[in-house]
């Protein structure tokens, strides 16, 4: 975590007020998405056209053991508070975070800011409204950044040639309706429903990671993450998310791999035959469990001011679906991405990418992104 934080901090170029121990930083990305093969239906399949992502962050140092961070984000969902928390640090091995933050889960959320990753959109397991057909799929496995209220205890231990990180946390967790079939992400950012836990029961999670120094400019990192809880108001519908990630830095070449899986319990209701597309199995049992998993494989290679990126990612959903859903009992989408990021002035980058979506339930789609992103 600290290795990543140092890289991000160096790339973000914050404005620092040494006298007051304050840091101010931010980033902006303007991206244009088009679906050239089906331009007439693009608005119904995703957020085609221009979208902007803005983040503004203020960090305040109150001394050796206490800091505060506040971050405001603006994107397609409007203005949101991306973080507002205190860090109470005893030493490297023990830090307590309280407030509103992104809990430690997976690798990509550490670099979710558009200024810190080279593609215009996020990997499919972490999608937050940018993938084609995101409404039909109801996003990925866990949208990033996942922002929530709660408490986290984390720390880092340094040993010869290695760095060990851990985190455990309790947060409000994802939300859904009574009798729901999946998470309803609008409930987590709707002022009408309040920014509070919907069932009074915390969601808990943990992460453990290791980074190994393999020599000059060579680092191997790996991590495991988990999160579990209930998402309905009655706290009867449970979920479990597990993830594994690995990355390898070889001089200036970066290779990343990540896998996420979520098991979600859903309500079958009083009349499942009318509600769901598929009936009971041959044994007469109607399953109330769905599986949603996804993967992401990436390689980045810079050549001076130009960085080439190749990405292969995908999603799968298995389990019953609503009778009105266009998905099947097992639905899959694979995406192939070729991207170029060009440093045009300072840390400002021009991002371009071509993505091929291979759907099991819809026509395949070609998506083209062109955008500009940078920190300040």
Which ranges hold each PLM region?
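Juxtamembrane/transmembrane-helix boundary motifs at the membrane-water interface
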Residues: 36-38
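Cleavable N-terminal export/targeting peptides
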Residues: 1-13, 127-128
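Outer-membrane beta-barrel pore domains
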Residues: 40-43, 84-88, 109, 118, ...
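Charged, glycine/proline-rich intrinsically disordered loops and linkers
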Residues: 120-126, 130-137, 184-189, 274-282
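Loop-centered beta-sheet repeat module
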Residues: 176-233
């Amino acid at each position: 975590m600290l290795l990543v934080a140092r890289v991000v901090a160096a790339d973000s170029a914050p404005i620092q007020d040494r006298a007051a121990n304050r840091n101010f930083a931010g980033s902006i990305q303007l991206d244009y998405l088009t679906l050239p093969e089906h331009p007439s239906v693009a608005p119904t399949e995703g957020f085609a056209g221009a979208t902007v992502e803005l983040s503004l962050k203020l960090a305040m140092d109150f001394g050796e053991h206490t800091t505060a961070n506040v971050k405001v984000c603006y994107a397609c969902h409007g203005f949101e508070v991306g973080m507002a928390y205190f860090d109470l640090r005893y030493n490297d091995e023990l830090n307590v975070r309280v407030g509103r933050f992104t809990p430690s889960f997976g690798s990509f959320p550490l670099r979710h800011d558009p200024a810190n990753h080279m593609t215009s959109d996020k990997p499919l397991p972490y999608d937050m409204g940018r993938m084609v057909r995101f409404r039909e799929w109801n996003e990925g496995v866990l949208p990033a950044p996942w922002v929530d209220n709660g408490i986290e205890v984390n720390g880092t231990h340094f040993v010869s040639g290695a760095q060990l990180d851990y985190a455990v946390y309790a947060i409000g967790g994802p939300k859904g309706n009574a009798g729901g079939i999946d998470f309803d992400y609008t409930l987590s950012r709707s002022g009408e429903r309040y920014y509070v836990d919907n069932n009074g029961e915390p969601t808990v999670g943990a992460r453990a990671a290791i980074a190994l120094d393999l020599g000059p400019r060579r680092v191997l990192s790996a991590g495991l993450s988990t999160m579990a809880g209930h998402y309905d108001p009655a706290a009867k519908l449970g979920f479990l998310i597990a993830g594994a990630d690995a990355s390898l830095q070889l001089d200036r070449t970066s290779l990343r791999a990540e896998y996420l899986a979520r098991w979600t319990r859903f309500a079958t209701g009083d009349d499942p035959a009318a509600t769901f597309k598929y009936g009971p199995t041959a044994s007469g049992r109607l399953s109330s469990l769905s599986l949603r998993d996804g993967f992401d494989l990436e390689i980045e290679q810079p050549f001076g001011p130009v960085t080439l990126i190749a990405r292969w990612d995908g999603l799968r959903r298995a389990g019953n679906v609503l009778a009105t859903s266009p998905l099947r009992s097992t639905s899959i989408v694979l995406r192939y991405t070729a991207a170029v990021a060009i440093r045009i002035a300072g840390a400002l980058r021009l991002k371009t990418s071509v993505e091929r979506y291979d759907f099991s339930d819809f026509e395949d789609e070609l998506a083209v992104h062109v955008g500009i992103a940078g920190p300040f």
